[in-house]
Structures are given as C-alpha cells and as structure tokens.
Regions:
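Residue-level detector of alpha-helix initiation sites
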Residues: 16, 89-93, 224
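Active-site flanking residues adjacent to catalytic metal/cofactor-binding acidic residues
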Residues: 12, 34-38, 114, 135, ...
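Phosphate-binding loop of NTP-binding sites
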Residues: 23, 43-49, 56-187, 192, ...
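Nucleotide phosphate-binding/pyrophosphate-handling subdomain across enzymes
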Residues: 24, 216-282
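N-terminal leader/targeting and accessory segments in enzymes
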Residues: 1-69, 73, 255, 277
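Beta-strand->loop->alpha-helix junctions that form or flank phosphate-binding loops
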Residues: 37-40, 68-73, 191-192, 200-213, ...
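Conserved dinucleotide-binding and phosphotransfer motif residues
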Residues: 28-29, 104-106, 236
C-alpha cells in the first residue's frame, strides 16, 4: 500500500518528467485514476482530483496544497539522503564533481539525478539506507516545494529566467526553497553573492572571488570555486580526507559545452563554452 493508492491523480505536463511520473505511479501504487493534461490551468477541474503532479516549467503563481511535483514527493521520502545543488550557473558541473568525489571517497552508492535529464522518481526505488543522492535542482523544480534536502548547496545568483519570474526577487524565492524548509541539523553551503535565506540549518558561506587552489582538468577560477563546495561537503559531511578529495577532484572530467577543450591551432586554443548564456558565466 502507498499513499497514492485509491487516489484520483492528474499529471499536468507530459514531457520527460510527466511520463516518468506516470510510470512511477503505475509501478509503485494503485491509484483510482491517472489522467494526463497539457493545457492551461484554467482547463483543470481541480475538484475531480485528490492530487495534481505539476511538471517543472509550467507557471503557477500561487501555492496550492493539492499540487505537488516529483521533487516534492522524492524529498518527502528521501530528503535526508539528498545533497541538493542549485545556482544560476555551475550547478551541473558541481553536481558532476560532487558525484565523482563522493563515489570515489565514501565507499557508498551515490546517485546523480535531477535537472541533468534524470527524473528523480526513476530512481526512487534504488535509494537504500546508505545511499547518497546528488540532486541538481533548477528553479522550476524547487518552486512551490515545502520540503528541503538535508544538505543544500546554493552556488550563486544572477539575473536569469526573468521572462518566467518577472523579477529577481521572485526568481530567488523559487531557488531559496532549497533551504527554507531545512531543519536543525541540516546544512546549507551558500555562495557569498546569494541573499540571506531564513533557515534553521547550519550555514557555511563560501566567498566568491577568492582563488581556490585546486588542480582540476576543467579550467577556470569559477570551477575552482565550485570545487570548494564539493571539498567542504565531502570533508565536513562525509569525513573524506583532504588528500583523497583533492586527488579525486584532479581526476574529474568536465561536461560538454562548459569550457570544453576543442583543439589548438598555432598559438590559439579553442574551447566550447556555448552553455554560457549570461555575461557572468562567460
């Protein structure tokens, strides 16, 4: 028996995450009804359903307890095992580095999922008592959530997605959900350019603009800054040694389109950094 048994459920949005939600519900429970809907909210008969799964990116301006998401449901079940990583830029690289280092240094199973094209409910059944989950979290996945991960990493905040959120304050409020529901005993690692977040977690501020002395395959001071978050989480939360974390970081490879080495001709070296879509990322 699960909490979804016998319920009438609507999946709002049928992209990758919507299809994943449908598969999860059919695999793990026995709802009385599963409907799919891809239109505007005005077309939803909310009284017909007990629960509505909203896909990321579908705009909803106010909270409603009848609405939930993959992120919300995953955190309810496994939030104590999750390292959530967000930020305007750097979250994919940091998530990759975190997964690599913890896989090398802890001896525990580590799952990488989330905003890298891996819907969390696809991995729901793989989480065990000793599992570590590295969850890349977008603003859309965090918006309207009422649960936060045990360890939160908030790298930075710049102006982005204002076509969706209208103001930086609203954009920040969506991302801040990564920490606003944290409790005593939880941890928040936050970049120095991120505004204050009200949280019960213990807070560690990582200074942006400093030079962090990590030997990485991936170039850029911003990646050494990202590596500082990984180092602090690995050593402070999981007891990894300085030597093993630095060695693991030095062996990690980068991601496509993020200062990816292309080649050299003469005295000119070429990198593909096409993922940089705002000036601060360039």
């Amino acid at each position: 028996m699960t909490e979804y048994d016998g319920k009438k459920i609507l999946i709002w949005g049928y992209g990758r995450e919507g299809r994943s939600t449908e598969a999860f519900l059919k695999r793990n429970s026995a709802p009385a009804l599963i409907d799919i809907y891809e239109g505007d909210r005005s077309g939803i008969d909310e009284d017909k359903y007990d629960l509505i799964f909203k896909s990321p990116g579908i705009r909803m301006d106010e909270d409603d307890p009848k609405y939930t998401s993959q992120t919300e449901e995953f955190l309810k079940a496994h939030g104590d095992k999750v390292i959530g990583i967000t930020g305007t830029k750097g979250k994919s690289t940091t998530s990759m580095l975190m997964h690599h280092v913890l896989s090398e240094c802890t001896g525990r199973p580590v799952i990488l999922l989330g905003n890298i094209g891996k819907p969390c409910l696809d991995y729901y059944d793989e989480v065990r008592d000793d599992t570590i989950v590295v969850y890349e979290m977008s603003c859309h996945q965090l918006a309207h959530t009422d649960v936060s991960p045990h360890v939160a990493v908030f790298l930075n905040l710049y102006e982005e997605h204002l076509d969706y959120y209208d103001t930086v304050d609203r954009y920040f409020a969506a991302k801040a959900h990564i920490a606003t529901a944290q409790r005593t005993g939880d941890r928040l690692y936050v970049g120095s350019n991120v505004p204050h977040i009200d949280t019960y977690a213990s807070v560690t501020v990582i200074e942006e603009g400093r030079e962090y002395g990590y030997d990485l395959k991936i170039p850029g001071a911003h990646n050494r800054y990202n590596a500082e978050f990984v180092y602090r989480v690995a050593t402070e939360e999981f007891g990894c040694s300085d030597e093993e974390v630095r060695k693991s970081l030095s062996q990690a490879k980068g991601l496509p389109h993020r200062l990816e080495y292309v080649g050299a001709k003469g005295e000119v070296t070429y990198y593909d950094d096409s993922i940089s879509t705002i000036p601060e990322a360039a």
